[in-house]
Amino acid sequence: MTTNDMAGIRRASGCASLLLALVISTAASAADAPNQAPALTLEKSVFLMRHGARSPNQTPEQLAPSSRRPWPQWPVGPGELTERGISLLTTLGGYYRQSYAAAGLLPEKGCPEAGTVAAWADNVVRRVPLSAQALLDGMFPGCGLQTGFAPQDKGPDPLFNPVEVGLCKLSVPKASAAILKAARGSLDQAARGERASLKAMQDILLVRSGTRCVNDAPSCGIEDFGNVLEGGKTGVTIEGGLKSATTVGENFLLQYIQGFPEKDVAWGDAATPETLSPLLGPRNLYLRLSRQPPYIAARNGSPLARALLAALDDASEASDASPAPGAPPRASRLVAFVGRDTHLASITGMLGLQWSLPDQPDQFPMGGTLAFERLINPADGKRYVRMVLYYQTLQQMRSNVPLDLAHPPGRLVVKMPGCDKGEIDGACPLPTVRKHFEAAFAADCPGG
C-alpha cells in the first residue's frame, strides 16, 4: 500500500467520522426539540392603565390641619393631571410603540390602520381621559387618534363605576365582613403592621389629634389613629388612620414625582427613595383591605373584567359580552382601558394577582399598565396570555427619564394562579385564562 493510498484511507475515515458526528448531533437536537418552548408570536395587547401623575386631591388649605408646616402650592387645581404627568405618559407611549413595533404588533412608522388601536377611559374625573389621550399621542404623534369616554353629563360610566350607578349591588354587611377577614379580624391590628411607617410619617407631620385615638387616648399622632368601617350607598370605606396616612403618603409621592426641590418634598424629610418609600406602605395596605377582597373586587370590577376578557378573547362568544360604549373593534391590535388605582385593585383582587416592585413603592403606580398580551403558537394555532406590568421606576418619574428599547421602564411578568400546567415562558393558555376570569365574575353583576 502506497503512501497516497494510506492518505486516502485516512481522509475517508475522517469524513466518515465527521458524518457520524453530524448524524449524532442532528439526532440529539431532534431529541431535545420537544423540550424547547415554542416561539410565540404577539398578536394583541389589552391594557388596563392607571391615569398619570396629578396634583393632590386637596388644596393646601384643606391639608393644613394635618401638619404644623404649610403644604406647597401646585401649578394646577386639585386632582388635575400635571404637565409632568402628561410628559411621563407620552414617554411611556413612545416606548410602547417601539417595543410593540419590534414585536411586529404595531407599525414602526406612520399611523396605525383604522380600528387597530383603541382607548376607552373612565369619565368621572378629567385626568383619566386626558391621560388616555397623552398615551395615544405618545404612541402615534400627529395621527389624531381620539380617546373614547362616556358623556360626562350622563353620569358615571357603568363600566368603571358599577356600584356607584347601581348596576352591581354591594351588601354593606358582606363587604364589611370581607374587609375584616382581610384584616384578620381587626383594622387597628392590621395597621400595626405599618407602625414603623406611620411613626416616620408622624415625625414629619408633628400634629396630634383628639379624634379616633386607639384606647380612647385624649390625643395621639397618626400612628395611633383608630380605624373604623363606615357603610354608605356605594359601599364601605375605612375611615381613620390608614385613610389619612394614604392621603399623606401619596401627596409626598406626588411632590417627588413632580420634581419639587428636595426641601419641598415632605419639607425635606422624605426626599429620597429610601426615606419616601416606606411612607407608601399604609396606602398599599389600605387598597388591599378596601378594594381587593374578592367579594368587593367582584362587585366593583366585574363589568370591566368582562370587557377586558371580551377584548382579549375577541374570536369567541365572550366578545359579545363587551359593553357597547367601550367595546373596541374586533380588528384592534392594541386596546387600552384607562382608569384609576381602584380599578387596578379591583381587577387584581378578582384574579388573585399579587406583586411587589423593588424600585417603585406604589403598588399601582401612576401610569402603570397591566398588559394582557395575547400570543399565538404558529405551529398549532393555540393562543396564550402573558400578563405584564409596565411601570416607571421612582427615579425615572422623578427625573422624567427618556425611555427606549435600550432604556426601558420597569417590567414584571405577573403570574396568574392556576396556570402552572401548559404555561410557556410566563404565558398561560387562553382557555385557562378565560376560565379564571369567568370564575371570578359576580354572577349577579352584568356587563356595563
Give, region by region, the residue ranges found by the protein language model:
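Bacterial N-terminal signal peptides
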Residues: 15-26
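Detector for intrinsically disordered, low-structure N-terminal pre-sequences
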Residues: 11, 22-23, 48
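Residue-level marker of intrinsically disordered, low-complexity segments enriched
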Residues: 4-7, 21-22, 401
